[in-house]
Amino acid sequence: MRKSSLDARRMKAIGAGLVTGLALSMIVSAAQAQTRQGGRAPLVLADEGTFYAGGHYDQDHPARHIVGQVFVEYRIPADLKHPFPIVLVHGGNQSGSGWFSTPDGRPGWAQYFLRQGYAIYVVDQVARGRSAVVPEAYGSVATAQPLQYVLEKFTSQERYKLWPQASLHTQWPGKAEPGDPAFDQYWSSDIPGMQNRTLQAQMNIDALAALFDRIGPAILLVHSQSGAYAWPLAQARPDLVKAIVAAEPAGPPVHDVVVQSAQVFDTPWEKAIKQTDDDYYRDNPGVKPYGLTSTPLAYTPPVTAASPLQFVHQDKPERRDLARCWRQAEPARKLVAVGDRPILVVEAEASFYAGYNHCNVEYLEQAGVHTTFIRLADIGIHGNGHMMMMEKNSDEIAQVMVDWLDKVVGPMEAKQR
């Protein structure tokens, strides 16, 4: 039963004196809540709830579990200002909880978008968080990320300097080390996903398509790993995915890359770069057969076994601190339907993605997909790592996304004219 129904029944059952007392209590509670939220007025919701989207009965194992479903938590603000909700899909080793609060206890992007008048739908990816894990159907769980890896890549890269931009990192809250309350909160949220990444991706794409079928047209916000779901989902539901906001989406195209200083020399990048004339970034040998993804993408002309995509490597990087990009051999095939909506890619200044986010954008553009690319440093937002939604200036970054959405999608009133 919803809270509004309970309140209505209670109000009918009490007298005028109790109503007055209740009103005073609500005023005090609201003031206390505003104090807890740093002076912000309490969030007022018109509706909230949870459900599961997608999934099917597993016919391959005796237990016949439902598999492939995602858990969804939704909240609709009382002051709804925008026609399309935002679907937030977390990245690797995370769950939807990371959208609701930062490790140091501030409201997260979910609350920020709610306060701007957006309804939100927050997903736990298949086999993560509150989406059930069914080992016989999903296979092995990936090995957990080592603590040292997380320190080097996500929270304290400025100490290790394993890629050119790492030393610019300043925005992680707290000391970014074990025992620090904010770091311990973040490390507590780490959840490994499936070992089979292609299966994981396809299950999530299918479940997200079912979610859009249920809720109707919406904006898709992805981060990191889930960025690879955005392009096939846009093709699967071309009329429902109204815009894509991609915070450092999975990449780069064709090959993942490794950083030589971390993998070869195990030294800070300034020293490593002096020891080789080779590329600073090296390609992982694995190939993404559809360029941006390992899961199928529709191209024109079509990709077939007899006519696969052909790729070429950029002769030299645009700068020494950037990776050389892989592109399609010309004439490039075009991605079907992906470019039929506004797309934003956001890059954080000190992230390990800062060396190759541009490769995703260039690949999309070559395939006929116009993309807005915002390097946060270019607009005066400095010091962020890959987990930008958890860092000290997270609200400032969310506002960049809101401003862009206001331009390309617009508020409710504009859609009603």
Predicted regions and their residues:
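Short substrate-entry loop that stabilizes the transition state in hydrolases
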Residues: 92-104, 110, 129-130, 253-254, ...
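Conserved acidic catalytic loop of the alpha/beta-hydrolase fold
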Residues: 171-173, 177-182, 188-191, 196-219
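Short beta-strand element of the alpha/beta-hydrolase
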Residues: 82-91
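Conserved alpha/beta-hydrolase
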Residues: 106-133
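Gly/Ala-rich beta-loop-alpha elbow adjacent to hydrolase catalytic centers
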Residues: 221-230
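N-terminal cap/lid segment of alpha/beta-hydrolase-fold proteins
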Residues: 35-81
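Catalytic active-site module of serine/aspartate enzymes centered on a nucleophile-bearing elbow/loop
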Residues: 381-383, 387-417
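Short beta-strand/loop motif that positions the catalytic acidic residue
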Residues: 339, 345-347
